[in-house]
Amino acid sequence: MDVALVFSLLVMFIFFLQISFSFWEKAGGLVAGSADSSIKVSVDVVPSISIDSPSDVDLSPNIQETGSATGSATWNIKTNNSNGWKLEVSALDTPAMKSGSDSFADYTEGTPGTPETWSISSSDSEFGFGASGSYADASFSGNKYLGFDGSNRIQVAHRNAQAGGSGDDTTVNFKAEVGSGHNQPDGTYSATVTATATTL
């Protein structure tokens, strides 16, 4: 065979291979390089708060003519707010504890708005509350009490940090007393108390 012919055929074959390789590369048969594309993935965790609803409270023992009765309710607060929370209580009515047209007076402090050791006049009947627990306001320590102020909220506890994993507990202690010289009409007296948890 003629050498020139062989050479021509070889050149044509090499050219054909080059064309085929180029086509294969463009079709994705080979990756000749790389390209990057970056994105940011984000999520917002917003502050939230919840409070449970404990059972209704029956003060005990029953008051027969004179004497006192006590009871308590514990509220659990959960929040992821890093600044913390506060707990306030209020009453539906003024005075809070009623039975029809009869009532117990809201506890009267010697210094209005300052919790104090429970003490009432023998001629009165009064109803009030205190607070206890790790986050109860220090003013309530030593088993001190306040009177409700109708629907005005009164702070009883706070924490300047997010709640623990199982939430934070605060116990509100209730007390009603009929003085030895007071004639309180019989009946079932009740107070509707609302606890409000708020993020700080």
Question: Residue spans of the language-model regions?
Answer:
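N-terminal Sec-pathway targeting helices
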Residues: 1-7
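Signature of Gram-negative chaperone-usher
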Residues: 2, 19-200
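Bacterial N-terminal signal peptides
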Residues: 7-20
